[in-house]
UniProtKB/Swiss-Prot annotation:
Species of origin: Castanea sativa
Protein name listed in UniProt: Large ribosomal subunit protein eL20
GO CC entries: ribonucleoprotein complex; ribosome
Disulfide bonds listed in the record: none
SUPFAM superfamilies with a match to the protein in the record: RplX-like
Amino acid sequence: MVTFRFHQYQVVGRGLPSETDEHPKIYRMKLWATNEVRAKSKFWYFLRKLKKVKKSNGQMLAINEIFEKNPTKIKNYGIWLRYQSRTGYHNMYKEYRDTTLNGAVEQMYIEMASRHRVRFPCIQIIKTATIPAKLCKRESSKQFHNSKIKFPLVTRKIRPPSRKLKTHYKASRPNLFM
């Protein structure tokens, strides 16, 4: 089983009950973090931005890690995200093929860091979804939908026809080019 750096958490929290509001609204968020502590921190960060609820006046109700139902089947994942670059905020849609959503999210973080120089704190995942093959948009994920796909054999190692011709030290370096 592959261990991923980012785990998906479901965090549930609310503002503290007061005399004016005895039953405050409960908020639930699904987010990715390396551990539970960072997931809680991210939850309060988003809640402070979206609603008038701060950690000092808030209450954490539950935090659960979400696991994939069948992590052996390859699926197409779509990720809608918002990221902060040197020029401002941008919205983006990305597609990945992976066995788990955590794997697809990790691919996304690696790609965003390499292509756009955007690190983990500057990326906000808006939505994720499993996408059927006919609704895929990106060519990078569509190329694997062909059932007759072939991969080229890049290097060919020539083996000796008999054990007698097998030597540990060759007089000349073998040519592996096809």
